[in-house]
Amino acid sequence: MTLRRFRAAVVQTHAELGDLATNIARSRQHVLEAVRQGAQLVVLPECMNSGYLFDSKAHCLTLAEPLDGAYCQALAQMAREHGIHLGAGLTERGDDGQAYNSAVLFDPSGALIGHYRKQFLPAQDQRWFSVGDLGNPVVDTALGRIGLLVCFDGRIPEVARCLAAQGAEIILDMANFFVMGQADLFVPARAMENGVWILAATKAGVERSIYYPGGSLIVAPTGEVRARIANDAHGVAVAEIVVGTEQGSAWANGGCKWADRRPQAYGLMARRFDDTPLAPLLNHALAPGTACVKIAAVQAHADSQHGTADGLAMARHAVLLGARLLAMPLHFGAASAAPTAADAARLAARTPALIDELHQLCAEHGVFAVLPTIEAGTSGLWPVAVLIGRQGVIGRQPQVHLAPQDKAWAGAEQAHDFVVFDTPIGRLGIAMGHDGLFPESTRVLALLGADIVMWPSAWQHPDERRLLAVSRAVDNRLYLVCANRADAPCPGGSFVIPPNGFPHWDVDVNAPPTTRWGAVMPMFAELALARQKCMEPGVDLLRNRLPHTYGVLTQSPLPSSHLTRSTAS
């Protein structure tokens, strides 16, 4: 792999509605400042040629311009004059007469080398823009492989995921962020889960009824913010970008973000929405007053100071609190968050008894519980989550993605699929341990119709909770019950995330992590909220996807351009 090191800049400014000359001058001013600070790659915000809040589709089309229009000519001239790569958001008038919310990228010769049309449109975009029809293109440049997306595309995992799966090392996000959560939560989450740099340039200011708070930032493949422009300010932020290294290619547990994927389990992601199990469920009537249940993450498990009896006692206390669905932490009966081969064998031998003991609790109180454990099968040991109810074992969810620690004792590699269990308290799914780190896991469970997903975990890094957990719930509009071990490298912090997330983008503000062994974190879950998949009118997080463009996510192996990068870790 070739190591490349350069400086890049994001621009935070404002576009005047319908004032092309001012918008060109403003773009030129900020590009000049970015170049003065040494930037070789500069990113401008969304719809920078025209402004954004149009009167109508006809008004939008009068301000839109083709790829050889005045704004693109100005961008090409800037790129050529300064010898830089320059990306910007463009209100485009296509050859088909439709308006598109597009992104363009010019190389140092002034040639247009990247062109993308926004796929996931918010409500206002749907009034004047057509859905993008160019797929998820990635372009090779002297700086590295670059992909483009536009603002709201980052609110679903697939667009950035498809770019990264094609080997993108850098993603440019031309944005009009309306709320800070888009910048401060979702951009770092997408960077972290994909192991890519993301350069997000947004606006600051007021355009008619829109307030743009700002929040332009440059995020490393680890999810670390390397540069950010203050809210309500105009200017540039510059950071050093390094590509061609293994930075961000591995999870904190040492597993590879790409080599550990299991594409054979993701087929549902590329299927038409109407052909998924979720589609008919969204038309089923629910009585809100009865379609509700109290659920809880129970932060209790065996460790150096507690036995399984202590953990089961805490589960009983949670039932007395009114919980009807209990999620226990990863490897509940093991005394270590990372069991050795000997530990795993002992837990597997103990599993039948643990199932019986938890079944007694479920039968006595009419509740449901998820027991994350290890079982012995014909191919050896394997991590499995057992769903137990009043009648006994309802079903099992084998772990789909093995962590490095699991591979030390797990049996022969097996191909497992995700399953969802239909119960009287809702449709339940499980993303066990390493599974929860991969956005495909919760997406497939959502498409299978899960209302509630349990994530038994032993988090290795705070950002697995701070960035990934909330996006896993909100991306799919489902309840996510995170039951984390108190002895994990990132201890405790178990909690339940509702389908619509929290009021503040910072999860630690909404739910400060509790590290105490035995903590019970309950939530009153309303299934109607989990069946409502729109984040705003007409913007369905599942139905509005473009599955026909996601084929790369179900390919095994990945394209060779990506394997070169992913297998280096």
Placement of each model-derived feature along the sequence:
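Short beta-strand segments enriched in small/hydrophobic residues
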Residues: T2-H14, A285-Q305
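CN hydrolase (nitrilase-like) catalytic-core segments centered on the catalytic cysteine
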Residues: E65-G87, G154-A237, L347-V370, L437-P522
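Conserved beta-strand and immediately adjacent loop positions that scaffold enzyme active sites
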Residues: R7, G87, S102, G135, ...
